[in-house]
Amino acid sequence: MSTSRSDALKAEADRSDNDVEKLLRPQSLDEFVGQEKIKENLNVFMKAALQRGETLDHVLLSGPPGLGKTTLAHIIANEMGARIRTSSGPVLEKPADIAGVLTNLEEGDLLFIDEIHRLSSVVEEYLYSAMEDYRIDIVIDQGPNARTVQIDLPPFTMVGATTRKGLLTAPLRARFGIDFRYDYYTADLLQEITQRSARILDVETTPDGAYEIARRSRGTPRVANRLLRRTRDFAEVEGDGEITKAIADRALNALDVDEEGLDDMDARILLTLIDNFDGGPTGLKNLAVSVGEESGTLEEVYEPYLIQEGFMERTPQGRVALQRAYDHFDRSSPAADQDLFDQE
């Protein structure tokens, strides 16, 4: 297959996956499964703002990727009857970029900035007055002819999403009146999400088939929906189209997703810690180089779940594998080896 043909097929597949993700995305708080505390509080805040005829206060959504931050931003826009404008931290490189976005907002609009922790400090400073006073100051010309022009903005709602809240500066965090942190989902909630997605995709699933996908989805709806789509492929090719527990187990094993929901990279991280670094501690950069992945990806995508589930921990000295990791891969821990040595 030619490179151009391969690239074209990949682009088409990416578009298809994006279309499916949009199709599966809940459109209202009632459709949104899980994160009950966030939903309850947000419902109150939105109703109060609507009753007062005001825009909703600025909202910060933080937590690991794939838990529904972007989805909730769109739901807020739907519930508030607002137009949503979307961007991301890496795209807004210069003051002119953010100024262009802000000056095109209309009253009541919702501006969603994903990966807001990746905004440059210069761009971030423009947001301070925009969020607090609904105005920005733009410098016209250069040198002795330079002058500042103040532009008033209509009231709007900023929704920022981040996987690394700690990287946000204190002044920016302080300008968000509503601050929510996402938790990982339970297997039962993910089963509910999986069954809802299956109905939308017109895929037959048994309850235990949906649960098998759910419990091996790293507590993450995005992962559950992705595994559902891939399991559907196995059900159609190797079965009668219905996702049963047996089909789900077959598909997930073929995708290198083990009984604990760990994928190939999870295993590489933990086994590298155990085998190459004697369980740790070792630094993030050393670990990233050893497994061939970006340190930021390890820290944002993989480590939160492994830490949450007790496979590893972060210490001041570095990353350390915990006993559950040794047990999972049937390895003997240094502590167990020492106990055995002491008994001899």
Swiss-Prot record:
Residue numbers binding Mg(2+): T70
Pfam families this protein is in? AAA_lid_4, RuvB_C, RuvB_N
Recorded GO cellular component terms are: cytoplasm; Holliday junction resolvase complex
| GO biological-process terms attached to the record | DNA recombination; DNA repair
- Subcellular location, record wording: Cytoplasm
Q: Tell me the domain of life.
A: Bacteria
UniProt-listed Enzyme Commission number(s)? 3.6.4.-
Is DNA repair one of the keywords UniProt gives this record?
yes
The entry marks the following residues as binding ATP, namely L24, R25, G66, K69, T70, T71, E132, D133, Y134, R175, Y185, R222
Question: Example GO molecular function term?
Answer: ATP hydrolysis activity
What SUPFAM superfamilies does this protein map onto?
P-loop containing nucleoside triphosphate hydrolases, Winged helix' DNA-binding domain
Residue ranges of region Large ATPase domain (RuvB-L)? 1-185
Residues of the region (Head domain (RuvB-H)) are: 259-344
Is RNA-binding a UniProt keyword of this protein? no
Q: Quote the catalytic activity from the record.
A: ATP + H2O = ADP + phosphate + H(+)
Residues binding DNA are R314, R319
Alphabetized, the UniProt keywords read: ATP-binding, Cytoplasm, DNA damage, DNA recombination, DNA repair, DNA-binding, Hydrolase, Nucleotide-binding
Q: Which parts of the sequence are annotated with region: Small ATPAse domain (RuvB-S)? A: 186-256
Family membership noted in the UniProt record: Belongs to the RuvB family.
What does the subunit section of this Swiss-Prot or TrEMBL entry state?
A: Homohexamer. Forms an RuvA(8)-RuvB(12)-Holliday junction (HJ) complex. HJ DNA is sandwiched between 2 RuvA tetramers; dsDNA enters through RuvA and exits via RuvB. An RuvB hexamer assembles on each DNA strand where it exits the tetramer. Each RuvB hexamer is contacted by two RuvA subunits (via domain III) on 2 adjacent RuvB subunits; this complex drives branch migration. In the full resolvosome a probable DNA-RuvA(4)-RuvB(12)-RuvC(2) complex forms which resolves the HJ.
Q: What does this protein do?
A: The RuvA-RuvB-RuvC complex processes Holliday junction (HJ) DNA during genetic recombination and DNA repair, while the RuvA-RuvB complex plays an important role in the rescue of blocked DNA replication forks via replication fork reversal (RFR). RuvA specifically binds to HJ cruciform DNA, conferring on it an open structure. The RuvB hexamer acts as an ATP-dependent pump, pulling dsDNA into and through the RuvAB complex. RuvB forms 2 homohexamers on either side of HJ DNA bound by 1 or 2 RuvA tetramers; 4 subunits per hexamer contact DNA at a time.
- Domain annotation text? Has 3 domains, the large (RuvB-L) and small ATPase (RuvB-S) domains and the C-terminal head (RuvB-H) domain. The head domain binds DNA, while the ATPase domains jointly bind ATP, ADP or are empty depending on the state of the subunit in the translocation cycle. During a single DNA translocation step the structure of each domain remains the same, but their relative positions change.
**Protein's name in the database:** Holliday junction branch migration complex subunit RuvB
Classification from the root reads:
Bacteria, Pseudomonadati, Rhodothermota, Rhodothermia, Rhodothermales
Q: Which gene encodes it?
A: ruvB
